[in-house]
Curated annotation (Swiss-Prot):
Keyword Lyase: no
The species this protein was found in: Bos taurus
Subcellular location: Membrane
Transmembrane segments annotated in the record for this chain: 77-97, 114-134, 178-198
The protein's name: Transmembrane protein 267
Gene: TMEM267
Recorded superkingdom: Eukaryota
InterPro entries: TMEM267
PANTHER family: TRANSMEMBRANE PROTEIN 267
Amino acid sequence: MASETEKTHALLQSCSTESLLSSLGLGLFCTVADRLLQFPIIQQNAWLRALSDNSVHCVIGMWSWAIVIGIRKKTDFGEIILAGFLASVIDIDHFLLSGSLSLKAALSLPRRPFLHCSTVIPTVVLTLKFTMHFFKLKDSWCFLPWMLFISWTSHHIRDGIRHGLWMCPFGKTSPLPFWLYVIITSSLPHICSFVMYFTGTRQMMSSKHGIHIDV
């Protein structure tokens, strides 16, 4: 576990100018990107709409993880790209549920696919964490559950502005206000960063991989 000094340092770092500017940039990107996706030229083309929407999920996932770890060396880009992949790959469940590679079928489902159930996120994250602990991978890959949590949660929050959050088996919420989506997305990297410090994950990342955290 992190010491009190490390916890205090985490709090100060998370309020740094660089970190706050990055979060403001992320919030601005969310606002502009989702407004641009409403343009008729995008909305009238199913493939363009789907690819654009998925690309925004990908960028938000990458940006969020970049805020968490900072970009200090070339290997950091690998993690950032992985975060973007995790944020966008969720939508593959549309095709799995439809049982077809047809985009029309994937967009005309009778219900929401299983990876869009928000209670799946803590289930998968905790399962991954326990699996890594069992196979003694918790040091080398300690960042992975957090990356998965941030990437998938950002995807669900963004989808929530249209459909609400599906909290199976408890039902779903009303659609999230756009302003709440922007605030949660911008704040999520900082919230995770705090908890990672409190649990010692950040110190483990630094000692094992030489990652210099600047959030």
